[in-house]
Amino acid sequence: KLNRLRPIALENLLVELRKRTFRGKPLQEATVQKYLSVVSAVLSDAKRNEIIQKNPARMIDLPDTAQKAQAIPTDKEAEEFLNIIADIDDPYKTFYALAIYTGCRRGELCALKWSDFIVDGYEGILTISRSRSMVPGKGIVEGSTKNGRSRTIYMSEDMMNILRSYCYDKWQEALNGGFPFSDYLFTNERWELMHPDTFTKYLRRLYDENGFPKEYHLHTLRHYFVSTMLHNGVDKQTVAELAGHGDTG
C-alpha cells in the first residue's frame, strides 16, 4: 500500500538502480534522478487525492552533491578505511569513526557534545538531537536534526575505545594549553568549532591518497552503516529510526 511506503525504501531503490548498467556502463546519475522524479510525481498525485498524507520521495536523504552516485563500500574497503584512519590524527580519526559506526550526518557529528554520550560498561549510548550546517548569509547555524527529532544509537566497544582516547587527549590539550575544555567534541587547536567543510575536504584527500573510488564522499560512510544494518537482518523500520530518516511512523 502507498501509505506504507517509507523514504528508506526509495533510497534502497536508488542504490539498486545505481548498481545497474546500460551497454556495459553504470546508469548516469541524471537517469537515476529521472526515475525518482517519475515516482515523486505519482506520489504527489496520490497526496493530492488524499491517498497518502506525505510524499516520501521528497524526504529522500541524498548526499550533499546529489549528482554523485551513492556508492557503498564493500566490507573489505570499510575494514581498510578503519585501518587507515587508525593512523591519522584527531579530531579526524574520531570524526570518521563515528560516521561509519553510527551513520550520523556531517552536521550532526559537528554538533556533538560530550554530554550526548553515556558510558554503559564497555559500550556506550549516543543521543543525536542537533545539527550544524552552512546557511547562506548567516554562516554556520546550529539547529535541530533533519527530521526534527532526536534519536539514540548504541555504540560498540571499539568505538568507545576510540572516543575515550580522544577525550583523554583533549583534556591533556586543554590542560597544557590553558584552554577551558569545550562542550563540543570537534574543535581545532584554538578550541574553536571546526567548519563542516574541513572534514569533507580532508576525507577527499584521504580517499585519493589511498586509491578509493572517486565517487566516495563523506556521506558514503553513512550509506555503509545503513546497508550493513540491513544486511545483518535489522528491520527497515529500525534502520530508518537509527539513521534519522524523515517519516518513520
Q: Where are the predicted features?
A:
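Conserved catalytic core of the tyrosine transesterase superfamily
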Residues: 12, 86-97, 123-125
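N-terminal core-binding DNA-recognition domain of tyrosine site-specific recombinases/integrases
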Residues: 1-51, 67, 88, 193-198, ...
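Active-site/catalytic core of tyrosine-dependent DNA strand-transfer enzymes
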Residues: 131, 156-213
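Conserved tyrosine-mediated DNA breakage-rejoining catalytic core shared by Y-recombinases
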Residues: 59-62, 71, 75-77, 112-171
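Phosphate-coordinating loops and pocket residues in cytosolic domains that bind phosphorylated ligands
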Residues: 4-7, 19, 53, 62, ...
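Short, charged phosphate-coordinating catalytic segments
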Residues: 44-56, 78, 99-132, 237
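C-terminal catalytic core of tyrosine-transesterase DNA break-rejoin enzymes
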Residues: 48, 94-97, 101-108, 197-209, ...
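Long, amphipathic, Lys/Arg-enriched alpha-helical "connector/arm" segment
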Residues: 8, 65-91, 101-104, 158
